[in-house]
Amino acid sequence: MKKWLALLLVVIMAFSLFACSGGNSNNSPSPNNSGTSGGSDTSSPASSGTGSPGSSETSSPPAGSNNDSSAGLDGTVDHFARDPYTISYVYGNSAPINIGFTQALEDFGKRMNFTVKSTGADFDPARVLEIIQADIDLGVDGFLINVMSETYPREHEMLREAGIPYINVMGPYFDAQGNNMAPAVAFNGYQAGSDITDWWLDNYPAYLGDADLSSIGFMVVTFTVALEFTERSDGALDRFRELHPELEDNIYYVDLTNFSMDIAYDSVAATVSGNAEIEKWVIFAVAEDFAVGANRAVESLNRVGSIIVLTTGNDVAFEEWGNNATPQLVALVPVWKTSMMGAAAEGIIALVDGRETEDTLWKELRRPNDVATLFYVETEVVTRDTYRDFIARIDAQFGIS
């Protein structure tokens, strides 16, 4: 019998949250949080992505290129031969990822002669459009937009009417047929999930000892209200099913009711406690907030050493690894600020300069039928032993020492 743990989705999010973006909780997870709910072992989770958790069909989004992190547009351009540009960065909330993105963008601005006007929208679609209109009226030169997908059609119209170039960050704007409609720098969540599965299947003995694979529970903690998180969990599960179709009953699918560390904490703790016969676990938390909750659950249950946690995102993990904390968090796919904002900065400045147009920008990477190019930054699994080398290599690609 398939052991799905499906936590019923509530309609509290009419829009899509963005990859690894921080949720609505900055509090430490509490085992007594009254906002959590259990799930049924027999119910099927809802899905906002392609495919479903119970399906063996490939649910990958249309594949773009998984590119080298450097966009390669800067070259020998003298950015200081012109007046400074003003670039508006509009983002969903003040989560650590967006703080890091803003800082990285400001650093690129010092090298590429632009200032940054950054504004958070508190996940309010109306506020997003207000910010965009206000910045259009101020006469900013370009936009980088990292917000909820329901605003995309209107923001696209507004910026086309204003004649101001923009690039979506993290979340592409797809039409009903799945075609990308505006330049975007994005994280390939499906590939990241697949990479995570490959990594743990190759490396789990180093962390879980001589446990037989058939005895290990594979828990995926996701949030299917948001497509980008669904893609990550789909990538991980599709790859696992492809390699080990006989281990379907080892999968435990936890679909959270909200983007919350607390709910992740309670859900992971309940799943582990409710399946006491499973001695070893691998937990893939598709967002770093969920990984924080999972880490705390592992600690509170005194299961460090018999459970390992994997995630996508790095704002908390790199700091904890640097402090030799959370030994159960063993690997992740970074959403690194230099990769994302370096490519985005190079792209938007090329558009504002007129060196590139929406049609020519990264055209060699464009998928058939797309109106504009979706540029995927590279995905790579790193550990506490390799993450510093990863940071140094990616930063060096963008000239950061």
Feature map (PLM): residue ranges:
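Hydrophobic alpha-helical segments within soluble ligand-binding/sensing domains
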Residues: 72-74, 79-83, 183-216, 264-265, ...
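Hydrophobic alpha-helical
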Residues: 143-161, 236, 256-321
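An alpha-beta-alpha
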Residues: 87-91, 105, 195-244, 251-253, ...
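Bacterial lipoprotein signal-peptidase II cleavage site
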Residues: 18-32, 36-42
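Periplasmic-binding protein-like
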Residues: 88-89, 139-147, 165-169, 219-220, ...
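Hinge/cleft segment of the Venus flytrap/periplasmic-binding protein
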Residues: 62-83, 215, 221-223, 336, ...
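Flexible loop/hinge segments that line or gate small-molecule binding clefts
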Residues: 155-191, 214, 316-326
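Hinge/beta->alpha junction and helix N-cap segments in small-molecule ligand-binding domains
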Residues: 90-102, 118-127, 170, 185-195, ...
